[in-house]
């Protein structure tokens, strides 16, 4: 068993949301299970699952020992951009799930990392997510950093939490954006009627900020660059749909059917910048646009304007 102390400093929020935000790799559902088991206490008393925190609250969380991992190492193609004793940066292909989940028990990036790195992956994220510091969606391609030890994992997670890890994406959106650049500052939370989707909402939401700029305009479409100030689930997809420009191919937040031969959002994690946990140096990694993205641009024809 491991115990952690968590102190609330921000405004009121649900206790399960605080736990999921404060404990790397802990999901909201896992936090709710801990609450139901009485594993979260305040002043020695179990905390109820609907408790709303206030600044200054201090909680003690008892985390169970991880069960032996049943994950299988699989020798899958892995595009390694950089690797050392502390971390590995990979260029994830479109269509690959990051970690095992119901319906995707193998063939994931985690399975590939287990084969490539062996046992040298951090355990902070839990048995289902060894080494995983952050995620990108199945149909999003591009850069992702994984940690090989807990020291690196905690340091990288801290940079994500304080928004000092820079993540740059490129996307193709529907419609022609009027301005050359802009910022979407709109809170994101679970969709009120569809738990598999996210939405711009005020209820149980967290601040989300996306900075975008135009790379090229096409007839009815725009190639853009996005910088994440925060990293909420589906953030770019939700924000661009919110301002009336859903991502090309996004069947969840935009289209009802595939468009331009693309089923799944046209979104690529192009660059990643962070402080190396061991050396303290600022490191930057980039990767080229993948073939599917370049094919989409070719189908759009010549840029306009």
In which residue ranges do the predicted regions lie?
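Thr-Gly-centered strand-to-loop micro-motif
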Residues: 42-43, 99-100, 147, 198-202, ...
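Methionine-biased hydrophobic packing positions in alpha-helices, especially
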Residues: 96, 196-198, 240
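Short flexible coil/turn linkers enriched for glycine and charged/polar residues
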Residues: 84, 138-139, 165, 206, ...
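Short alpha-helix capping/helix-loop boundary micro-motifs
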Residues: 43-48, 220-223, 258
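Pseudouridine synthases involved in rRNA/tRNA modification
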Residues: 1-33, 78, 193, 202-209, ...
């Amino acid at each position: 068993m491991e115990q952690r102390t968590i102190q609330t400093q921000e405004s009121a929020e649900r206790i399960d949301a605080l736990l999921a935000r404060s404990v790397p790799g802990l999901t909201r559902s896992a936090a709710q299970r801990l609450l139901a088991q009485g594993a979260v206490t305040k002043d020695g008393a179990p905390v109820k699952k609907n408790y709303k925190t206030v600044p200054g609250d201090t909680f003690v969380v008892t985390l169970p020992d991880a069960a032996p991992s049943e994950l299988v190492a699989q020798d899958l193609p892995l595009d390694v951009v950089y690797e050392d004793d502390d971390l590995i940066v990979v260029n994830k292909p479109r269509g690959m799930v990051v970690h095992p989940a119901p319906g995707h028990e193998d063939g994931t990036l985690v399975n590939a990392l287990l084969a490539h790195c062996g046992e040298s992956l951090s355990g902070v994220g839990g048995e289902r997510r060894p080494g995983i510091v952050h995620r990108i969606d199945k149909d999003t391609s591009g850069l992702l950093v994984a940690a090989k030890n807990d020291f690196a994992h905690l340091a990288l997670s801290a940079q994500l939490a304080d928004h000092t890890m820079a993540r740059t994406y490129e996307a193709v959106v529907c419609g022609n954006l009027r301005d050359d650049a802009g910022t979407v500052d709109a809170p994101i939370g679970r969709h009120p009627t569809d738990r598999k989707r996210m939405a711009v909402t005020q209820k149980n939401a967290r601040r989300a900020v996306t900075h975008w700029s135009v790379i090229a305009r096409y007839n009815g479409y725009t190639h853009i660059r996005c910088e994440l100030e925060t990293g909420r689930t589906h953030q770019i997809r939700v924000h661009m749909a919110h301002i009336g420009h859903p991502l090309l191919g996004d069947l969840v937040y935009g289209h009802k059917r595939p468009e331009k031969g693309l089923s799944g959002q046209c979104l690529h994690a192009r660059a990643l910048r962070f402080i190396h946990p061991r050396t303290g140096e600022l490191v930057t990694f980039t990767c080229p646009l993948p073939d599917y993205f370049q094919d989409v641009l070719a189908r759009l024809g010549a840029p306009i304007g």
